[in-house]
């Protein structure tokens, strides 16, 4: 079965231009930016030709990848969502990258260490960080000004502000998440906690309980 190399180029034949299919889950402006990056890379050299292919959402792309790997095919590059990535490694579908990487130490030192370590499993690097999702809080500045409020800088101030904005006609805070609950995880980690400790679920930690209690209130 063909092995997958997440987010790094595989050294292939140097005798002819090699097509490098890259399956990703970025549409809209992000997808157009990926296409532009690939076009620029392809124009700078003639050894590889990166071919970006949008595959739908993360879940849709993962389903297509599993089917392709079972059929003995699949892309050379794949944008793996963080929770799916270790599965590829565990099933032997990802290649270790140490032999292919010759990076300037200064380049690595300039990267955000936690993001750079996303691609490391069991002490070995199987992937490179490609994108990172960050929760963003949107608020209506005019409403804040009318109430004499400032943007909160910690969770206690956040809760006080939300209560001050709540009335019979409106809620001061609306929380939206998805089945993966990564936004809730961000609420826990921002308090200094973690949903996993010693390879076991940690949903009863002080930080996780505090996040749940705030949402309940």
PLM features: residue spans?
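Immediate post-signal peptide segment of exported/extracytoplasmic ligand-binding proteins
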Residues: 15-21, 42-48, 122-123, 145, ...
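Short, well-ordered beta-strand elements
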Residues: 17-27, 48-53, 77, 126
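Short beta-strand->loop
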Residues: 23-27, 127-132, 140, 147, ...
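Hinge/lid segment of periplasmic solute-binding proteins
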Residues: 82-136, 159, 186, 192
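Extracytoplasmic "Venus flytrap"/periplasmic binding protein-like
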Residues: 40, 44-111, 146-153
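Glycine-centered hinge/linker elements that transmit conformational signals in sensory
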Residues: 162-166, 200-217
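Solvent-exposed loop/turn segments at secondary-structure junctions
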Residues: 27-30, 57-59, 82-87, 133-136, ...
């Amino acid at each position: 079965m063909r092995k997958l190399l997440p987010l790094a180029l595989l050294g292939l034949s140097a005798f002819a231009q090699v097509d490098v299919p890259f399956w990703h889950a970025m549409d809209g402006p992000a997808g157009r930016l990926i296409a532009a990056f690939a076009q620029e890379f392809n124009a700078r050299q003639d050894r590889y030709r990166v071919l970006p292919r949008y595959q739908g959402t993360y879940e849709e792309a993962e389903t297509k990848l599993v089917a392709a790997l079972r059929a003995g095919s699949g892309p050379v590059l794949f944008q793996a969502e963080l929770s799916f990535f270790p599965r590829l490694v565990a099933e032997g579908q990802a290649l270790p990258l140490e032999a292919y990487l010759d990076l300037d130490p200064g380049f690595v030192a300039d990267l955000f260490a936690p993001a750079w370590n996303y691609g490391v499993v069991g002490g070995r690097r199987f992937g490179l960080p490609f994108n990172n999702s960050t929760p963003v809080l949107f608020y209506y500045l005019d409403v804040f000004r009318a109430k004499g409020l400032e943007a909160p800088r910690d969770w206690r101030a956040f809760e006080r502000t939300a209560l001050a904005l709540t009335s019979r006609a409106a809620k001061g805070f609306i929380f939206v998440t998805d089945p993966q609950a990564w936004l809730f995880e961000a609420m826990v980690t921002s308090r200094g906690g973690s949903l996993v400790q010693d390879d076991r679920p940690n949903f009863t930690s002080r930080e996780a309980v505090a996040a749940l209690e705030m949402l309940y209130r």
